[in-house]
Amino acid sequence: MSTEPLADPAAGLGDPYAASSRETTEGRVYTVTGGDWDEFIDESAGEERIVINFGPQHPSAHGVLRLVFELEGETIVKARSVIGYLHTGIEKNVEYRTWTQGVTFVTRMDYLAPLHNETAYCMAVEKLLGVEAPPRAQTFRVMLMELSRIASHLVFLATGAMEMGATTGMTFGFREREEVLHLLEYLTGLRMNHAFVRPGGVAQDLPEDYRQKVLDFIKVMDSRLPSYDKLFTGQPIWKQRLKDVGYLPLDGCMQLGVTGPVLRSAGLAWDLRKVQPYCGYEDYEFEVPTSTGADCYARYLLRLEEMHQSLKIIRQCLDKMEPGPVMVSDAKIAWPAKLTIGPDGMGNSLEHVRKIMGQSMESLIHHFKLVTEGFDVPPGQVYVPVESPRGELGYHVVSDGGTRPMRVHVREPSFVNLQALPAMVEGGLMADAIASLASLDPVMGGVDR
């Protein structure tokens, strides 16, 4: 890459989108602007091709995603993904918060799998601290992650059906998802972005009637999931729209770093819950669905079966849930009183405040400093991955020994998987690009973060 100043683009010389540099009092500063999609459009000028900008406002773009397609008739010759419209600087923001406050940021990236983000981040912090969440909290986390996985796959079905014109499937998917959100809201007070998993465990224990509510949910899902087979699997139009569309074989997945249902649909049974167990997943009996179809239809069938397996895991969680604490006993990490929500659902209950205020002055000071300043984490760096609904979600966390992270980098599966889209759609029809994008199931909050 040249570092020499560029020719004036107004004079028609040089590339206005290459790199330039200049000397400052702090050293050499490099500037890069523009993007290859502009060159892509310019290359097509004068040829019998048409360039279409799909998004970022299109309802089928799965958020603010821009796709640039170069077409010959109805066939896509070139495709480019343009991202960054939903950048929120979460990784940088976490560096300015305490370790516990970081949970409230990471839960907002992949907003369809918030509990997976929270768990992966907290596991990384716990690994740096050298502590392990109590068994009850581990089981608790597994149950919440599987509920979140079901909710995410239901959104995949609902939005994918809507984009294919199957509006009945959309209403079915969002109807079942509401059941999951009701469960999570009853427990955490929020439908999404829960910030419920904490370093050392979880925020609070299960309500007394929560077990029965989960059993009722399982009963509802067992009765309703077969309807998806009747509505989609045996539907000839649905099958024709997805079969042999968005083909991505195993070697392509491996070269692009694709994980999750897209990789398993190509025949590789790579699921971190099995190959690198965490949170006690090695003690649960469940299958990892795979296929060799490597197309949109195989990914649909795979996610449908994964919901059945998640229900199987949730049943085992309820059986394994033994009495015990849900937070480590280390007073330097855990708050001195169990957090309970007030009757209005908006703040701490009087019992919570009374327990803190009723202790010694030293306990009150410790609580105040623990909440406002946070706890110290020994210096070091770790990488902790979990299996999210979209693939390998990994957290690389670096500590310099202080009360805040020095660096948090996220290996986001939506970001990695999205780069496979050109390989899936180039050479295919424009109408099939919608199905291919839906089968990747990207969440732009995680892609752009």
UniProtKB/Swiss-Prot annotation:
It is a peripheral membrane protein. Its EC number is 7.1.1.-. Pfam families: Complex1_49kDa (PF00346). SUPFAM superfamilies: HydB/Nqo4-like (SSF56762). Keywords: Cell membrane, Membrane, NAD, Quinone, Translocase, Transport. It is an enzyme of class 7 (translocase). It is found in: Cell membrane. One of its GO terms (molecular function) is NADH:ubiquinone reductase (non-electrogenic) activity. Coiled coil: none annotated. Signal peptide: none annotated. It catalyses: a quinone + NADH + 5 H(+)(in) = a quinol + NAD(+) + 4 H(+)(out). One of its GO terms (cellular component) is plasma membrane. Belongs to the complex I 49 kDa subunit family. NDH-1 is composed of 14 different subunits. Subunits NuoB, C, D, E, F, and G constitute the peripheral sector of the complex. NDH-1 shuttles electrons from NADH, via FMN and iron-sulfur (Fe-S) centers, to quinones in the respiratory chain. The immediate electron acceptor for the enzyme in this species is believed to be a menaquinone. Couples the redox reaction to proton translocation (for every two electrons transferred, four hydrogen ions are translocated across the cytoplasmic membrane), and thus conserves the redox energy in a proton gradient. This is NADH-quinone oxidoreductase subunit D. It comes from Saccharopolyspora erythraea (strain ATCC 11635 / DSM 40517 / JCM 4748 / NBRC 13426 / NCIMB 8594 / NRRL 2338).
